[in-house]
Amino acid sequence: MNRRTDADSWDPASSVGATATMVAASRARASRGPDALLDDRLAGPLVRAVGLQPLVRMIDGDTAVDDPPSSPRSLNEQIAVRTRYFDDFFTAAGAGGIRQAVILASGLDTRAYRLNWPSGMTVYEIDQPQVIEFKTRTLAEFGALPCPDHRPIGIDLREDWPSALRQRGFDAGQPTAWIAEGLLVYLPPEAQDRLFDNIAELSTPRSQVATEHFPDPNGFSGPRAQRLSERWHRMGMDLDMAELIYHGDRNTVIDYLADHGWRVRARTFEEMHAHNGFEPPDDEMMALFGGMSYVTGIRK
């Protein structure tokens, strides 16, 4: 595959879009069986509709992910920790009175359809036009219903997405809950800063943002990227992490948010496993995600 360019685009079966489908397949796998760790009943049908056969086989259980020393249980726990963190973030924001939610780079995220949103909540989703069109059309064909006020927006986050958001009725005078899940490494370093600058500009006090933080902002280059690529290849996916991410020095999330008007709380990868009642992550999970924190910022 080719290295990223500033004008590239994708659908759920290609490039960065395929990684979103892979995450959906992980949610589907963790939602299977009597010991399911998640309840995302739409993830599996979406993955089937995309049609990437290695991922279809994975959710069907027809092929094991040959990924020692990580067990299937460890892999399911990892995606459960991540998914629950952002689910709980939105649930708490709604309980606290926030009535605007924005899912940035939503991919095959189904929260607009499966979370119990409070009355009056408006949920915006932003992603590539092909991704938004595929998901909304496919879920409509399945008969899935989103929350009553669901406003998907097809635009690249490297473009003027704040204007597109306002055009769909976003009210910058009201507190908002934002998530940027699994997104930042796919943005150029300057676009990451611009993303958080735009979020800050659109956020009144009491607004909240949730994302992930790595103490080494270039942590997904080098050995981590190689490990992920090897895992994907064993699954039958022709993806190379080093070709999908943007390289170069970037600001650390916690410091950038703290320096730009947010009160920040971070919970480590290991802490969140314990919070969910899981055993400590195994060595392979730590090699991939050790040092990572889940971060919430509250606008001052």
Curated annotation (Swiss-Prot):
The keyword Transferase applies. S-adenosyl-L-methionine binds at residues 127, 156-157. It comes from the Bacteria. Keywords: Methyltransferase, S-adenosyl-L-methionine, Transferase. GO terms for biological process: methylation. One of its GO terms (molecular function) is methyltransferase activity. InterPro entries: Ppm1/Ppm2/Tcmp, SAM-dependent_MTases_sf, SAM_mthyl_Trfase_ML2640-like. Its EC number is 2.1.1.-. Gene3D superfamilies: Vaccinia Virus protein VP39. Belongs to the UPF0677 family. Exhibits S-adenosyl-L-methionine-dependent methyltransferase activity. This is Putative S-adenosyl-L-methionine-dependent methyltransferase MUL_0817.
